[in-house]
């Protein structure tokens, strides 16, 4: 599996989008209308647009996200377009942008919380660590295997997480031809 990183601070990107006019809240503090919203994936967050075909909206939101990155460099490492996320990271989905947090910055979905809450703040109410970060960050947990179907003494310096499931399926004798990835070169 993948590791976890300690949370240093929580960033509420939806609160920024409210302040920028991309989300309008009702009297109950919940969205009544939106043009863009953030949906947290932990240390990264996906930005969804009401109308992905509206080029003007796409441009406005992209500029706003880059402005937030410039204003909060301690919180935001990278803003990916959907095309960049697919090309560079193999990440696809219904989102228009992906925002990658700086090391230790957790994204949450609140619309009304303070934009930034440090771990030392009395307002901090999150767990201590989580995942959802870029693969270049954090510890790299080992994959350890042994048994009658495993070649002894094999060490792989690095591997793709997508290759874990095909490895386990091969060990179980399950044929899954449509699966992404390939078994680790550890099988007899």
Predicted regions and their residues:
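Secreted, luminal/periplasmic, and some membrane-associated catalytic domains
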Residues: 2-119, 123-125
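Substrate-binding rim/cap in mid-to-C-terminal beta-strand-loop elements of soluble/periplasmic
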Residues: 22-55, 126-171
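Short clusters of hydrophobic/aromatic residues that line enzyme substrate/ligand-binding pockets
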Residues: 79, 150, 184
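Cytosolic regulatory/linker segments at or just downstream of nucleotide-handling modules
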Residues: 182-188
């Amino acid at each position: 599996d993948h590791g976890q990183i300690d949370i240093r601070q929580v960033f509420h990107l939806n609160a920024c989008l409210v302040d920028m006019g991309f989300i309008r809240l009702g009297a109950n503090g919940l969205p009544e209308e939106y043009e863009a919203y953030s949906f947290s994936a932990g240390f990264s967050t996906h930005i969804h647009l009401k109308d992905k075909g509206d080029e003007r909206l796409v441009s406005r939101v992209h500029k706003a996200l880059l402005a937030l990155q410039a204003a909060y460099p301690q919180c935001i490492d990278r803003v990916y377009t959907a095309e960049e996320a697919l090309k560079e990271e193999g990440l696809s989905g219904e989102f228009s942008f992906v925002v990658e947090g700086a090391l230790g910055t957790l994204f949450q979905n609140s619309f009304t919380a303070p934009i930034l809450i440090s771990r030392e703040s009395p307002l901090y109410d999150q767990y201590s660590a989580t995942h959802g970060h870029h693969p270049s960050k954090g510890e790299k947990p080992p994959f350890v295997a042994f048994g009658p179907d495993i070649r002894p003494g094999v060490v792989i310096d690095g591997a793709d997480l997508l290759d874990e499931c095909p490895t386990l399926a091969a060990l179980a004798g399950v044929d899954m031809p449509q699966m992404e990835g390939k078994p680790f070169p550890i099988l007899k």
